[in-house]
Amino acid sequence: VDPESPMNVRVELGDVENIGQIPNSNFEAFHEEKSGLTKKEDQADHWHSFINSETTALTSSAKMKHNWKSNDVRPGSTGTSSLEVKSRTVLGQSANGTVTTGRIKAGSITAEDPANCSYLDLSNTEKDKKGDPYYTILTCKPDAIEFWTKFFVGKREESNKDNIYATISAAITDGTYYQDPQDNDNYTNVVATAKNDKIESLDNTWQKLTVPFNYKETDKAAKAILVTISTCSVPGGGSLSDKDGEQDAIKIDDMRLVYNANATSIKFKGEELTEEEGVYYTTFNGEVKNSDLEVETDSKSAYVTKSIFNTEDGVIAIINIVSNDLKTANRYVILIEGATT
């Protein structure tokens, strides 16, 4: 591409597999996971559930099947499977169906106790039956997490009739121990978080959701991501039935981390510029510097560069915005008539 061509060019740098993405986020790969001699489930590769959770002597009954491989896929999918997660009952209590990129810890018989959590820790050397670790490495900084879901609210009683939402949460950390929900307010290893605890059923139809990340003011580097999905936003607040058709059930398909690279505002010497047929025009009689151009983007982590060139008609400024995963770039061209460098 000619850098001095007066065009706004969008460049797709290609889809390099798994860079900046969660492995198997399309939920096409599954393996059999077992607990003991009789308990087993089809578990999505790189994702984990209660069947391979950490338990205590009092909570060992939590190791039961919650996950299923489903052939019900989102509209327009090129794949053939999705992940289905269902609630179960344990000792007469509702056990929310949960899946995570980390590991589940069932540390208490009290549902709302933060000893019941998902966690990641890059120093953890344990692996699942397939050989995958209980964490997901991520060194990029996405702007949002996007996924397709179909949610069914199971049987409700008077005591839990208002508990009608599923939930997803994500945390990007520096890779040291982190759990969700947090057991204290002293975690300083968080880079960004995203959460939606109001996932509705919409009559059990497929819906596409996007949840933005909120970035912290921190010098910690992104090294890992913990994503957790649950059939109920209230711990132990879901269906009290283990019958098919009465359990809470959520299906997840085609998840991806979103990396933006768009300009939301371009200013020259404080004046907002508008685009006309792919070019931003303005006039100025005098010398132009890169610092005269202000750019705002829809990403806190995109890379922005500015260049200026003399032409017969004035100055052409080129603004390049590259997404944090380096897969997408946008170019913006500004013609400043009458100016010099």
Identify the residue ranges that each predicted region occupies.
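Beta-rich interaction/scaffold domains
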Residues: 2-13, 260-341
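Secondary-structure boundary elements
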Residues: 6, 150-157, 216-220
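Aromatic (Trp/Tyr/Phe) and Gly/Pro-enriched flexible surface segments
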Residues: 13-142, 146, 164-173, 179-210, ...
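Generic hydrophobic alpha-helical segments
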Residues: 34, 153-154, 302
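Solvent-exposed loop and beta-edge segments used for protein-protein assembly and interaction
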Residues: 138-141, 162-164, 219-221, 287-289, ...
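Short edge beta-strand/loop segments characteristic of extracellular beta-sandwich folds
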Residues: 146-150, 294-296
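Extended, low-complexity, turn-rich repeat/linker tracts enriched in Gly/Pro/Ser/Thr and Asp/Glu
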Residues: 151-164, 176-179
